[in-house]
């Protein structure tokens, strides 16, 4: 065991060294260097504090993040590295970073102006186009710098664009940004904020096949521009997770009101919001667009000055209005007054609130509907004595309007203070409207008063046709006239409205709106004629125009019996708010009683800012946007609920009148939005012209009930949702007549007046039948809202270019504001939850990627090790074989050498013996010759001896030489034979060794090929498993997102159910009070009708009263049952809707899961195909490798054979020469032998 393993087991040595980061200081307390001086907010991953450097006093935003481990610290290093590496005037700078006690402190440059979205919410309006241009230009510069440095921001939105006090912007929050290593590198992470996500980023939720690049930021920039133009991004009403499907499948979003914006702006958005990534412009291209050719940041400096201005708030309650209502409710009921028959429920305020129609009006009205307008006009003309004084009042008011407006225009350049009119000046005389320097008063309701009187004339004419006594008619006229005088005094309170004049035309339009609304039967031709004249107004509005708040106050004359009845038939306070500049006109949505004659005062407060006289005239509507919210869901506001119980007759008449009023209202509000007050050095005066409205004409009702188009306009001043261009009421509610309610009453209401002669009970039931249909649908909500409502007045004072400017805005604080704030808070919570989820997913993805990369590295290392091991094994075997062969050859050679030596010695010994024998034989031959010579004669003996010796010597020498040569040849032959045998043996051994070596090499290559194939299989299995792991994690993350989405949906549904339960509880609690008040009113009206038509005896009257009381009790019981049934239906419908939403959500989730599974199957199939192709290519390359190897083996065998053949032929080619071995053993020559 090595020492390191030993140390690991016993945990010896130091702990793992902490990783050091370049820009993060460790083990230093940041509070030693920075002082916390305040809290800026609570971010998604920690709190953000305002800090100041103790040495340099530099301010910073300190983001403190609690990190539980070093691994979590890694998640924030990308953000810190990006902040540290960026040096651009439009990107926040990193000032310091600490890691201390498991807290990561990131201190970045402090931007005192705050985020763009926070500024819009503070000012309660979007940015103007000039402001958007500056923000867009500087943001583009920052993005271009980031993209040039290979950085994708991935979370661009208004909340991450910060203002400085100098009017510049800085891009912040790089928490989910990506820093690439290559310019063309792409990303496939599903990360960012849903509303601003590009479609290609959304697609990465289920498919990683099409990664995205830097152009994803360009899409987010386009969405951010829409957000700055409309306060909220597109699809903001959707759940953060459900919006993803909308982005992926729908067309690119556009501006809600395109006509308000320049063509350059719209073209710029089109270039940004291009779903085709290749066609989408880059930041460098967008910088050349004419929309961003701006240099001055003055619009932003003005915006910041206003946002950071000193604000004084004043909260005003509506107590005075309640007192007026109580006074009105305490007035005596004229004999000629009675509950109206709901002639129309068009969207006018007077039609919704006034309910003082003449008695018997419904029947006579029905009779007269079939008549022509000429007859109606003639009846109106016949009533001149009744209308003289109101007409004079109208003329009087018009004169005062002109005076007040002219005086206002001459003094408009002075700073104007807003003075609350009704609280300080109670009941001034109608003939003496005050014209003061501090309070310009404009009577915008005088025309409406005249029209109201016309309606009253018509209704009184109808009364005269149905009454039988001239005395009773005179009494009614007298009471009517007295009531009008009282009403005129009341109207004086409400029409004396203090107006810091926006323009004379604005007041005119408001008057026109009221006049149109008061004329129930106004024909379309008259309306169009009036609109044609009114459309000639200017189209600029001063920036910083303060809010105008119109409130509707009225009480039904039929409800003036007691204070309890004051809550009966007040229409709903569903507000129609149209913002012109910063102008709000609150109008109830739908009213239950529309045919009455009571004038509805409109309280209109316009507060004018002090504006530099030499200021550019073209500063227009840009600083205060026109906003119109159009709700398309019926029943979402209390005012809309009224339509559920309205009668068929109401629908029939309303279908015409509402259409007329809609057109008039739409066009006039549009005109009002274009009005401007231009203040230049010449102080031009604007002439005043208020037109009288044409006389009232009643439109004959259609024979069939028609759908009613009622514009449901609701402004949310905080959110600015569903903005529409003012005047273009493109979205309306289609309200169909309720066919299932009281078919008998429908027949009665659509009759021709014959019911007037039958009985007073039936008559009164017919008249009052409409009243019961609207009580349970929130008819007193306006009054309750008025009691609860408060007006919040904000005054901002700031200095722009050395000029002090004061902007005063008024806003009615209602429950909807708190609900909007609550919804915004909940939406922020949902986005924060999503951000946490994305951070966890990113961390899990990084961990998985690291794990998979480690697995790949490990398997590739193992492959390499196995290959090296296998090669080493066979190389070792071959080496051993070669070593063994070498040793064998050496041993054989040694053996052969020894054998050759021994054989040569043996042969030499034998030859020496034979030579010795041969020499002995020659000696003996010599002796024989001597003996022969001795036998010869003595004299011849000497000579013969000599001759015979010479002959013998020559003969013996030749024989000996031949014998020795023969012996040498025999020796060489024997040795050569031995050598040949040795060579053959060596050749065999070498051939065998070569064969063995080649077999080993074949085995080595086969093993390598097998190993390669196995590695390919294992690599494929690993990649397949990794792909499954990746998709498993994607499915897991998708399911977690779906769980979170389902949880949010359930919370949302639960909120809806709770709201409905609370509303129904309030309605149930209100109903008994409404019924008691209504019962008193109806009983009083019934008794009065009995007194007027007193032809029966007192007993009969008492019986009728009892019968009426029984019918009333029955009717109230039916009302309670109808309300109960309605509540059950509402709850059932809501539950069904919630269930449908959940089903739809689950369906979308299942589609996403199915899509993910499809992608996984497709990727696995592609992986298998890639593996098959790779294996096929490998096998195709394997054949040439085998062939090459065999050819190499054959060549080596051939070379070996040639070598040994040549060696065999080269040895002993000349037998006469001594062999290589025998020459070392020389044969003794003749000289060595003695004689």
Swiss-Prot record:
Acidic residues composition bias: residue spans: 312-328, 638-650
Bias regions of kind Basic and acidic residues — which residues? Answer: 421-432, 522-539, 679-695
Q: What does the sequence similarity comment in the record state about its family?
A: Belongs to the protein kinase superfamily. STE Ser/Thr protein kinase family. STE20 subfamily.
Q: Name one Pfam family in it.
A: Pkinase
User: Which residues of the sequence carry a binding annotation for ATP?
Assistant: 40-48, 63
According to its UniProt record, where is this protein located? Answer: Cytoplasm
| Low complexity bias spans | 749-760
Tell me where it mainly resides: cytoplasm
- Has UniProt tagged this entry with the keyword rRNA-binding? no
> Which terms in the Gene Ontology molecular function aspect does this entry carry?
ATP binding; cadherin binding; identical protein binding; protein homodimerization activity; protein serine kinase activity; protein serine/threonine kinase activity
Q: Which residues carry this modification: Phosphoserine?
A: 14, 189, 330, 340-341, 344, 347-348, 354, 372, 518, 565, 571, 647, 655, 667, 777, 779, 818
Q: How is it modified after translation?
A: Proteolytically cleaved by caspase-3.
Q: Which residue range or ranges hold the UVR domain?
A: 875-910
User: Which tissues does the record link to its expression?
Assistant: Ubiquitously expressed. Highest expression is found in heart and in skeletal muscle.
Q: Where in the numbering of this chain does the Protein kinase domain appear? A: 34-292
**Gene Ontology, cellular component aspect:** cell leading edge; cytoplasm; cytosol; extracellular exosome; perinuclear region of cytoplasm
Q: What does this protein do?
A: Mediates apoptosis and actin stress fiber dissolution.
> Can you cite a GO biological process for this protein?
protein autophosphorylation
Q: Which UniProt keywords apply?
A: Apoptosis, ATP-binding, Coiled coil, Cytoplasm, Kinase, Nucleotide-binding, Phosphoprotein, Serine/threonine-protein kinase, Transferase
Signal peptide range: none
Q: Which residues carry this modification: Phosphothreonine?
A: 183, 569, 814, 1097
Q: Which residues bear the site annotation Cleavage?
A: 438-439
Q: Where is this region: Disordered?
A: 309-351, 363-393, 421-441, 519-539, 613-760
Q: Please give the name of this protein.
A: STE20-like serine/threonine-protein kinase
Q: Which residues form a coiled coil?
A: 826-1069, 1109-1183
The organism named in the record is Homo sapiens (Human)
């Amino acid at each position: 065991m090595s020492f390191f393993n030993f140390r690991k087991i016993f945990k010896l040595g130091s702990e793992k060294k902490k990783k050091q980061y370049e820009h993060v200081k460790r083990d230093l307390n940041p509070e030693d260097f920075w002082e916390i001086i305040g809290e800026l907010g609570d971010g998604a991953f920690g709190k953000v504090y305002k800090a100041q450097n103790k040495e340099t006093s530099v301010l910073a935003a300190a983001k403190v993040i609690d990190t539980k481990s070093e691994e979590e610290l890694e998640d924030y290093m990308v953000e810190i590295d990006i902040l540290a590496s960026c040096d651009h005037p439009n990107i926040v700078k990193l000032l310091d970073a600490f890691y201390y006690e498991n807290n990561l402190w990131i201190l970045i440059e402090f931007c005192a102006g705050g985020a763009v979205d926070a500024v819009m919410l503070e000012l309660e309006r979007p940015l103007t186009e000039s402001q958007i241009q500056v923000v867009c230009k500087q943001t583009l510069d920052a993005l271009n710098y980031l993209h040039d440095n290979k950085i994708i921001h991935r979370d661009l939105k208004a909340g991450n664009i910060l203002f400085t006090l100098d009017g510049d912007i800085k891009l912040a929050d790089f928490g989910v940004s990506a820093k690439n290593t290559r310019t063309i590198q792409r990303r496939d992470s599903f990360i960012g904020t849903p509303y601003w996500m590009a479609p290609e980023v959304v697609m990465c939720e289920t498919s990683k096949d099409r990664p995205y690049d830097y152009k994803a930021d360009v899409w987010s920039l386009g969405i951010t521009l829409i957000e700055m133009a409309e306060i909220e991004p597109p699809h903001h009403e959707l759940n953060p997770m459900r919006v993803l499907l909308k982005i992926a499948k729908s067309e690119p979003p556009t501006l809600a009101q395109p006509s308000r914006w320049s063509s350059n702006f719209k073209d710029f958005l089109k270039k940004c919001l291009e779903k085709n990534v290749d066609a989408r412009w880059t930041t460098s291209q967008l910088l050349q667009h004419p929309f961003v050719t701006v240099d001055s940041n003055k619009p932003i400096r003005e915006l910041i000055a206003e946002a950071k201005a000193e604000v004084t708030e004043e909260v005003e309650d509506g107590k005075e209005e309640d007192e007026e209502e109580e006074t009105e409710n305490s007035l005596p009921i004229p004999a000629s007054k009675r509950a109206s028959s709901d002639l129309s429920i068009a969207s006018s305020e007077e039609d919704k609130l006034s309910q003082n129609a003449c008695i018997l009006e419904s029947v006579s009205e029905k009779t007269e509907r079939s008549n022509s307008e000429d007859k109606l006009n003639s009846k109106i003309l016949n009533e001149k004595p009744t209308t003289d004084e109101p007409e004079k009042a109208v003329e009087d008011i018009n004169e005062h309007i002109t005076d007040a407006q002219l005086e206002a225009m001459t003094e408009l350049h002075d700073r104007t203070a807003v003075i609350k009119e009704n609280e300080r000046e109670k009941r001034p005389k109608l003939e003496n409207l005050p014209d003061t320097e501090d309070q310009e008063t404009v009577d915008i309701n005088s025309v409406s008063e005249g029209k109201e009187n016309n309606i009253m004339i018509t209704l009184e004419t109808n009364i005269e046709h149905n009454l039988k006594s001239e005395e009773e008619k005179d009494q009614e006229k007298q009471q009517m006239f007295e009531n009008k005088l009282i009403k005129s005094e009341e109207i004086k309170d409400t029409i004396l409205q203090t107006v810091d004049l926006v323009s004379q035309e604005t007041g005119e339009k408001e008057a026109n709106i009221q006049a149109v609304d008061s004329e129930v039967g106004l024909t379309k031709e008259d309306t169009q004629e009036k609109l044609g004249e009114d459309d000639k107004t200017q189209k600029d509005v001063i920036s910083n125009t303060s809010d105008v708040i119109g409130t509707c106050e009225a009480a039904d004359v039929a409800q003036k019996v007691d204070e309890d009845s004051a809550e009966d038939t007040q229409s709903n306070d569903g507000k129609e708010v149209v913002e012109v500049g910063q102008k709000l006109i609150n109008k109830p949505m739908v009213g239950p009683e529309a045919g009455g004659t009571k004038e509805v005062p409109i309280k209109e407060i316009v507060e004018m800012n002090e504006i530099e006289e030499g200021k550019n005239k073209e500063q227009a509507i840009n600083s205060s946007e026109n906003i119109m919210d159009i709700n398309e869901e019926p029943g979402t506001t209390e005012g809309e609920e009224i339509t559920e119980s309205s009668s068929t007759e109401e629908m029939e008449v309303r279908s015409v009148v509402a259409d007329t009023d809609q057109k008039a209202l739409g066009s006039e509000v549009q005109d009002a939005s274009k009005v401007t007050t231009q203040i230049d050095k010449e102080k031009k005066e604007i002439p005043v012209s208020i037109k009288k409205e044409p006389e009232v004409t009643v439109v004959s009702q259609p024979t069939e009930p028609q759908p009613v188009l009622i514009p449901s306009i609701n402004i949310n001043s905080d959110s600015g949702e569903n903005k529409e261009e003012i005047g273009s009421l493109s979205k309306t509610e289609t309200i169909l007549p309720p066919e299932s309610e009281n078919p008998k009453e429908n027949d009665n209401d659509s009759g021709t007046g014959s019911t007037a002669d039958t009985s007073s009970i039936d008559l009164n039931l017919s008249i009052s039948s409409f009243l019961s249909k609207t009580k349970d649908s929130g008819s007193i909500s306006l009054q309750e809202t008025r009691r609860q409502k408060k007006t919040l007045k904000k005054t901002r004072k700031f200095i722009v270019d050395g000029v002090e400017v004061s902007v005063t805005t008024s806003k009615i604080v209602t429950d909807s504001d708190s609900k909007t704030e609550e919804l915004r808070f909940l939406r922020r919570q949902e986005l924060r939850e999503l951000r946490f989820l994305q951070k966890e997913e990113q961390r899990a993805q990084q961990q998985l990627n690291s794990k998979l990369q480690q697995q790949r590295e490990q398997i590739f290392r193992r492959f390499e090790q196995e290959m090296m091991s296998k090669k080493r094994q066979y190389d070792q075997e071959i080496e051993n074989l070669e070593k063994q062969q070498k040793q064998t050859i050496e041993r054989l050679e040694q053996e052969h050498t020894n054998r050759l030596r021994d054989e040569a010695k043996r042969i030499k010994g034998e030859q020496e013996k034979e030579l010795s024998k041969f020499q002995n034989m020659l000696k003996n031959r010599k002796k024989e010759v001597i003996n022969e010579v001795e036998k010869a004669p003595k004299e011849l003996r000497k000579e013969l001896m000599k001759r015979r010796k010479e002959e013998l010597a020559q003969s013996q020498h030749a024989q000996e030489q031949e014998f020795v040569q023969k012996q040498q040849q025999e020796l060489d032959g024997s040795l050569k034979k031995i050598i040949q045998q040795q060579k053959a043996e060596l050749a065999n051994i070498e051939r065998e060794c070569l064969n063995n070596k080649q077999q080993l090499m074949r085995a080595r290559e086969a093993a390598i090929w097998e190993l390669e194939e196995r590695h390919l299989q294992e690599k494929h299995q690993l990649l397949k498993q990794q792909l499954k792991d990746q998709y498993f994690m994607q499915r897991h993350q998708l399911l977690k997102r779906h769980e979170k989405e389902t949880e949010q949906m359930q919370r949302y549904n639960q909120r809806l159910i709770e709201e409905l339960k609370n509303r129904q509880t309030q309605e149930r609690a209100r109903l008994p009070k409404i019924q008691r008040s209504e019962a008193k009113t109806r009983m009083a009206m019934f008794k009065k009708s009995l007194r007027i038509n007193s032809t029966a005896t007192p007993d009969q009257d008492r019986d009728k009263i009892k019968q009426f009381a029984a019918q009333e009790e029955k009717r109230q019981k039916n009302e309670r049952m109808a309300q109960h049934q309605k509540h059950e239906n509402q709850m059932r419908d809501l539950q069904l809707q919630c269930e449908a939403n959940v089903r739809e959500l689950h369906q979308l989730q299942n589609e996403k899961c199915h899509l993910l599974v499809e992608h996984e199957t497709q990727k696995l199939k592609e992986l298998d195909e890639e593996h098959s192709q790779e294996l096929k290519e490998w096998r195709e390359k394997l054949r040439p490798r085998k062939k090459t190897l065999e050819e190499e083996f054959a060549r080596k065998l051939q070379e070996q054979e040639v070598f040994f053949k040549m060696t065999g032929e080269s040895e002993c080619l000349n037998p006469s020469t001594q062999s290589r071995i025998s020459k070392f053993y020389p044969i003794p020559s003749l000289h060595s032998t003695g004689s």
